């Protein structure tokens, strides 16, 4: 039990007017450490007890069992708790050293599945920085879900169907060169895609041709299908190379095309339940009772189905296949209305498990304040960006540690980690402006800064030849150590908060805070000095490294032992 929960529990024993959870949320950290480690404001009880807050605080301080604390004292309207730092630090360090990387592992999920719809790039288009957010947020959430005891199922719902394939087939047949596409598939396909979109603005007949080719593709035309399959295969080879670089893997690549034969069932179910209404020749589901003004367009007047029809089929398939406890869609905020409709239609169909579905939305990545667009050719491609980040990391490592043995592997871990961490430290609903120089910096709130703190600790432990003894109790009570102990003790709650809010930035900010606290400790403490406290200090370093490495792992970022 962490100290905040312990204090809330002790207060709850003598304050029946408040739930323990409410007490927990009221606890404050005093600005001055001389006033204790945590404080309970008695104002919240003044109305119920009809007493002055100062009198309530004084009464509570006398009635609370103080045996587990150094001291409990009333100061004005607050009950201040002074923690037994030596005892708590011993408990925390013993726990972390014993558990290692399993420290803070939780069993809330009990092995139940969480489906994660993530990454989902469009076939025949380059993997850009715009796709990065869904990929790294989804990957981090998968690690966090597993830490909470769930079994994540990472689904790459590929954009491998739609009118754009009609456009691409027309472009390839008009201007494409097979040898050029085979040599540089994504580059060539992007050029064709940008060109046909530009020319279609002045030549409407190209749109008609594209629609015709997509109709042929839907009907199984051999030439159209072979071209589509080729575009898909070449794109996947490219994507998988990039996923390998990012250290991201998937459990399923079932994309839009996978559900082509599963949508008729959705239409039949909607028809059987009497939910489909005709509107101007199209089929819709009215959702006004859910506060959604616009009906969900299920089938257009020309008989074509829409994204929502496909997503309904996907939701049904995933529930039947994985029996998920939760299903999350890591998709940009611009799709918020779509996912509200999706959940509402499923609810209307009688599927209460739609309440377990969450749209994990996020803001846009911009460059110089401008929105990125593949169609207009305004795009930051991921592959050269990753290469540049690794190169910059290598240059910094060369300057700091030219004798480092495994420079290439470390540069890769730092460069890739820098890009991922910068994205993940941003509250996901906020966008950010892409700045590679800021990302790869070893100073400030960056991935390399946190990684360097971990590598610094490993260097200290190597110099000391220190490995903690599991049967030894280590404890510290100085202010700098205590700041680190409190953070380490808080790690399980940080994981739970990140899980509850689907928010990796909570984990990234924790990692920054822990790295900063350790660097402050390093600057003020002679860790390797040969005195009776040396092993206690080294045990703190050892535990800090475990938690830093695990926090980075939950973000999908490596923690090199040397930098």
Curated annotation (Swiss-Prot):
Q: What's in the keyword line of the UniProt record? A: Aminoacyl-tRNA synthetase, ATP-binding, Cytoplasm, Ligase, Nucleotide-binding, Protein biosynthesis
Q: Share an example GO biological-process annotation for this protein.
A: arginyl-tRNA aminoacylation
- Gene name in the database record: argS
Kindly state one GO CC term assigned in the UniProt record. cytoplasm
Known EC number: 6.1.1.19
Q: Which segment of this protein is annotated as the motif 'HIGH' region?
A: 121-131
Q: Which InterPro entries match?
A: Arg-tRNA-ligase (IPR001278), Arg-tRNA-synth_N (IPR005148), Arg-tRNA-synth_N_sf (IPR036695), ArgRS_core (IPR035684), DALR_anticod-bd (IPR008909), Rossmann-like_a/b/a_fold (IPR014729), tRNAsynth_Ia_anticodon-bd (IPR009080)
- Give compartment(s): Cytoplasm
**Which reaction is recorded as catalysed by this protein?**
tRNA(Arg) + L-arginine + ATP = L-arginyl-tRNA(Arg) + AMP + diphosphate
Gene Ontology molecular functions: arginine-tRNA ligase activity; ATP binding
Alphabetical list of Gene3D superfamilies matching this protein: Arginyl tRNA synthetase N-terminal domain, HUPs, Isoleucyl-tRNA Synthetase, Domain 1
Q: Does the keyword Glycoprotein apply?
A: no
Q: What is the lineage of its organism?
A: Bacteria, Bacillati, Bacillota, Bacilli, Lactobacillales
According to the lineage, what is the superkingdom?
Bacteria
ATP-binding is among the record's keywords:
yes
Please give the chief subcellular localization of this protein: cytoplasm
Q: What CDD domains does its record include?
A: Anticodon_Ia_Arg (cd07956), ArgRS_core (cd00671)
This chain's protein is named Arginine--tRNA ligase
């Amino acid at each position: 039990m962490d100290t905040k929960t312990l204090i809330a529990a002790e207060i709850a024993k003598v304050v029946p007017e408040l739930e323990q959870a409410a007490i927990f949320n009221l606890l404050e950290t005093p600005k001055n450490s001389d006033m204790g480690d945590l404080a309970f404001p008695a104002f919240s009880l003044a109305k119920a007890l009809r007493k002055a807050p100062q009198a309530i605080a004084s009464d509570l301080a006398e009635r609370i069992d103080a045996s587990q604390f150094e001291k409990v004292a009333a100061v004005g309207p607050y009950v201040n708790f002074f923690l037994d730092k030596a005892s708590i630090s011993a408990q925390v360090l013993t726990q972390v050293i014993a558990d290692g990387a399993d420290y803070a592992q939780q069993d809330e999920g009990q092995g139940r599945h969480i489906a994660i719809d993530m990454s989902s790039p469009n076939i025949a288009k380059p993997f850009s920085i715009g796709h990065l957010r869904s990929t790294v947020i989804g990957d981090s959430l998968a690690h966090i879900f597993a830490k909470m005891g769930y079994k994540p199922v990472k689904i790459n719902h590929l954009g491998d169907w739609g009118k754009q394939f009609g456009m691409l087939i027309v472009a390839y047949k008009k201007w494409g060169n097979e040898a050029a596409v085979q040599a540089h598939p994504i580059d060539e396909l992007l050029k064709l895609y940008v060109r046909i979109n530009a020319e279609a603005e002045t030549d409407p007949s190209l749109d008609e041709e594209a629609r015709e080719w997509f109709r042929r593709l839907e009907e199984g035309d051999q030439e159209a299908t072979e071209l589509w399959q080729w575009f898909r295969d070449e794109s996947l080879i490219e994507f998988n190379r990039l996923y390998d670089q990012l250290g991201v893997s998937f459990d399923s690549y079932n994309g839009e095309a996978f559900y082509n034969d599963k949508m008729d069932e959705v239409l039949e179910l909607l028809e059987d339940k009497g939910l489909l209404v005709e509107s101007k020749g199209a089929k819709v589901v009215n959702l006004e009772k859910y506060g959604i003004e616009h009906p969900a367009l299920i089938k257009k007047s020309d008989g074509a189905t829409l994204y929502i029809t496909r997503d309904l089929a996907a939701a049904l398939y995933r529930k039947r296949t994985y029996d998920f406890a939760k299903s999350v869609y890591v998709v940009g905020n611009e799709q918020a209305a779509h996912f509200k409709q999706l959940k509402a239609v499923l609810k209307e169909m009688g599927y209460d498990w739609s309440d377990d579905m969450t749209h994990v939305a996020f803001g846009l990545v911009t460059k110089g304040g401008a929105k990125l667009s593949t169609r207009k050719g305004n795009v930051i491609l991921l592959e050269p960006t990753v290469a540049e980040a690794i190169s910059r990391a290598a240059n910094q490592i060369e300057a700091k540690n030219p004798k480092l043995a495994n420079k290439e592997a470390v540069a890769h871990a730092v460069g890739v980690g820098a890009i991922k961490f910068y994205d993940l430290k941003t509250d996901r609903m906020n966008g950010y402006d892409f700045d590679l120089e800021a990302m790869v910096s070893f100073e400030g709130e960056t991935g390399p800064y946190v990684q360097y703190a971990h590598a610094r600790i490993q260097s200290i432990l190597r110099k000391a030849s220190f490995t903690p003894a599991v049967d030894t109790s280590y404890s510290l009570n100085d202010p700098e150590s205590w700041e680190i102990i409190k953070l380490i003790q808080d790690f399980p709650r940080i994981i739970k908060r990140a899980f509850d809010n689907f928010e990796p930035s909570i984990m990234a900010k924790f990692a920054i805070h822990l790295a900063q606290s350790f660097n402050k400790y390093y600057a003020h403490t002679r860790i390797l000095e040969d005195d009776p406290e040396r092993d206690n200090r080294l045990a703190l370093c050892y535990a800090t490294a475990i938690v830093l490495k695990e926090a980075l792992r939950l973000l999908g970022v490596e923690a090199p032992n040397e930098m």
